[in-house]
Amino acid sequence: MPLLKLWAGSLVMLAAVSLPLQAASPVKVGSKIDTEGALLGNIILQVLESHGVPTVNKVQLGTTPVVRGAITSGELDIYPEYTGNGAFFFKDENDAAWKNAQQGYEKVKKLDSEHNKLIWLTPAPANNTWTIAVRQDVAEKNKLTSLADLSRYLQEGGTFKLAASAEFIERADALPAFEKAYGFKLGQDQLLSLAGGDTAVTIKAAAQQTSGVNAAMAYGTDGPVAALGLQTLSDPQGVQPIYAPAPVVRESVLREYPQMAQWLQPVFASLDAKTLQQLNASIAVEGLDAKKVAADYLKQKGWTK
């Protein structure tokens, strides 16, 4: 083979080897502003970084509408979202599929892929559904174990004030759905609207009786509820969809880093309700940094060094 041809061929091979490295774009990792958002966002961030993926940290970017807008506009590349929010995103709250873990996942996966080129990866088995938690002393004194009991208590004129995010108060599939199903209506004087969506803040407000609050917006995987003396109320009518957390990534980014799906699959598969409650409690009750809690969990499980 002529030397010139050999030299040219070597350059082509070198370029082919070097191209992925040159083309590798930093992955913008985001999450919601609450405790679990910080935990899951840091888990995704650290898993990607452990495999040498360059990242931009946008963890705890904002509320659901903010983060959703960011990924659909390309400002974010990946973030953890909840399957049940598909009902809200696609204005499809009446479909019973959202109340079935597998059907809800398959539906939002299909819709987001078709409409937004967003890919839903393996979800966690946990259900982080919205709920209402009341102070233990109030629950015991008034025999409150379910939202039906709460409705009866309110109709009897019971004292009640709920700390919640504006999103929970306003979204049709959140507090208004509970009110409609159980036949009660909270007045403005019975609501304390708090910035952001961090249930650690709403639960703390109820525990400390801030501004007369004795109940809080909470999630099914919240760690601080029992630790701070509150009790979640069951939802016997099954008003809420299943909210299983899963990484959502832009299709173009997944094409660039196809191994991302297999890296994150076992991690999210390990996050059952008990595990998430414990990890969330480490942050919200013990005051540990979400970054450290995520790092310790990943190391303990052998997914990072």
From Swiss-Prot:
Leader sequence segment: 1-23
Keyword Signal on this protein?
Answer: yes
The family database entries (Pfam families) matched by this protein are listed as: OpuAC
Molecular function terms in GO for this entry?
A: transmembrane transporter activity
> Where does this polypeptide localize?
Periplasm
Q: Name one GO biological process term.
A: glycine betaine transport
* Source taxon at top rank: Bacteria
Please give the record's induction comment.
Expression is sigma S-dependent. Induced by both osmotic shock and entry into stationary phase.
Its quaternary organisation is: The complex is composed of two ATP-binding proteins (YehX), two transmembrane proteins (YehW and YehY) and a solute-binding protein (YehZ).
The family this protein is said to belong to: Belongs to the OsmX family.
Name by which UniProt lists this protein = Glycine betaine-binding protein YehZ
Organism expressing this protein natively = Escherichia coli (strain K12)
